[in-house]
Amino acid sequence: MDEIINKYQAVEKLFKEIQQGLAAYDQYKTLISEMMHYNNHIKQEYFNFLMIISPYLIRAHSGETLRNKVNNEIKRLILVENINTKISKTLVSVNFLLQKKLSTDGVKTKNMWCTNNPMLQVKTAHNLFKQLCDTQSKTQWVQTLKYKECKYCHTDMVFNTTQFGLQCPNCGCIQELMGTIFDETHFYNHDGQKAKSGIFNPNRHYRFWIEHILGRNSEQELGTKQDPCGTKVLQQLKKIIKRDNKCIALLTVENIRKMLKEINRTDLNNCVSLILRKLTGVGPPQISESILLRGEYIFTEAIKIREKVCKKGRINRNYYPYYIYKIFDAILPPNDTTNRRILQYIHLQGNDTLANNDSEWESICMELPEIKWKPTDRTHCVHFF
């Protein structure tokens, strides 16, 4: 970013020197006018560049971690917006204009190093142009981005075609590759094969459930056409709470699910975390991005292993919140009481289903070194709240 700003400032200084040099000659009035056109053009580009990066510069003052993230995003924007190319094109046009006009006019000067010598300004323009448009310099600047290196654990990332980007094999961090086209021939129907309706993407399921477990989903999901904000549902739940003399501060996921069943709104079971936050004023813990990414990576690996070891005769349907519960129960330290509150917001199924899931999870953990198997204890998370 600083390099781009320095380029714009250097170009502005260059234009000023050229115009001052040419002002001593009457025959260069047309050239000065044309130079003014390019000067205004590059000033507009500089203004647009500042408008693009200004929101990121404000965020950069929020801390060292966010500052590094913002700097990487600004570097990506510079590449996407082709800022270097735009500057180079303008410089090429100006350089061509100067060479053409000055050579055809054939003005002779007595002293080559006179301060008002326009040829001296041309020489300065040539030197600056070579400096700014040097191909090797630009290549070295691009290489410093290291887009394949994970920003969390600094290991080489691998391509993930289902995510259309790069994924870290250690922490699971996913980096989208803008403007990249992947070979999708393996998605197409081949002769003798039945076409599938869609591509299974475990990451999509993980993000859906994490969004709902953490209560980050839209409040519009609670509403209907007649009640867009879900006010009626919340009023019905408050009446039940008052009727049963329930303590709002002690409401649980199971309490909300039972009340939703009573008012025939079990379609909102996925929104229990959001409802709890609306009723109690206390929401789920805000898990850090690094922990969520690690959980996503383990979740994806667990689903892949499950497809290989799943028992015959069982319905091929996963209850994804169970997997998320087991993953966060394993990766969150016992003394991390704040983040372990997430377990309170995950509904677990009946005892028989839970026992079958635990048996299947044990088989998955045998091939999943990140997780150590242990049976699910429904009361395990009670002392954290």
UniProtKB/Swiss-Prot annotation:
Keywords: Late protein, Metal-binding, Zinc, Zinc-finger. One of its GO terms (molecular function) is zinc ion binding. InterPro entries: Poxvirus_VLTF3 (IPR007031), VLTF-3_Zn_ribbon (IPR014900). The keyword Zinc applies. A zinc finger (C2H2-type) spans 166-190. It holds the Pfam family Pox_VLTF3. One of its GO terms (biological process) is regulation of viral transcription. Belongs to the asfivirus B385R family. This is Zinc finger protein B385R. It comes from African swine fever virus (isolate Warthog/Namibia/Wart80/1980).
